[in-house]
Amino acid sequence: VDAFRFPRQYGFVKPGDEWMSVRNQVTTPNYLKHLDKIYYYEYLPESKTVYVRHSQIQDDKDEAIPAFYKKVFEFIDKNDVEKLVLDVRLNGGGNNYKNKPIVTGIIESKKINKPGKFFVIIGRRTFSACQNLVNELSNYTNAVFVGEPTSENINFYGDNRRIELPKTRLPVFLSFAWWQDKPQWENAPWLAPQLAVEMSFDDYKTNKDPALDACLNFSDQDLVLDPIGHLKELFMAGKLDQVEAEAKRMTGDPKYQYVNFEQKFNQAGYDLMNSKQMESALFVFQLNTKLYPKSANTWDSLAEACWKSGKTDKAVEYYNKAIELDPHGATGDNSRNALKQIKSQKTF
């Protein structure tokens, strides 16, 4: 069978003589409009919102990026606009040196660069030079990120070069340039949305756009944009009951599904323990076991904090709990080794 590629635009079927789309063609959602253009904007008067779809970091053949965004921001300044939605969910990258007029335009817009006024829709095709763009918007603007995680590491290798394998002579392309927009402790497999909104196949088929709907219906009272920072602030104020209540609420809320609370709490516990703040560390580790009782790692970490606090009996109990949850894995092995050390210390 001869190989072929189906006709497509940005991963979606392009209907033609031999291919048809499952999507209802009567109407077209904003993110699929004018796909012959790299970017376009539209005013949505009901919500006083300017919507921009930008799907490559390249100049469109009819209008360069600086000219396009100059027009967008002039429209915002001169009209009754309350929100800007920048949709880059289809944007696979390009030339990240072309990001500057987008970022500076947002920074300079007093009307838009405010919490709850500027939204960036991201998704599984947001990649490469567009990862640089969303990183910069995260660093320097009040963007609220909506949708699904990007498909690129926050810091990443890019800009490939052709090399030839020495034995097979096969050509391959390897990325060589390290792009680091954020410090290493903020690196992650992706940029996660602050407001998680998933899109189903049925949504696509029926022309629904839950991500855009979430932007248009956003209320800043409904969302904590920095969940970990929020919990840390409560913790530092000594409001431990509120820390626990808020942590339970947010870990059960699908809007925060891409926040790795377990890992963040675990790291916070170790930071406190390494600073000799043992009671605070114990509180954080105990909270993590309440939130994630089936995680062997949370019990292993709590056991270590108990051991270092002189609470050996509790350490033994919690290490055994970790082994029970992970009898054949690395965490279980770590707990068994810790128990051997505890036993040898008691014997000595």
State the predicted function of each range.
Residues 267, 301, 334-338:
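Canonical tetratricopeptide repeat
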Residues 1-263, 267, 325:
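C-terminal "post-core" interaction segments
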Residues 262, 296-297, 330:
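Helix-start (N-cap) detector for alpha-helical repeat units in TPR-like alpha-solenoids
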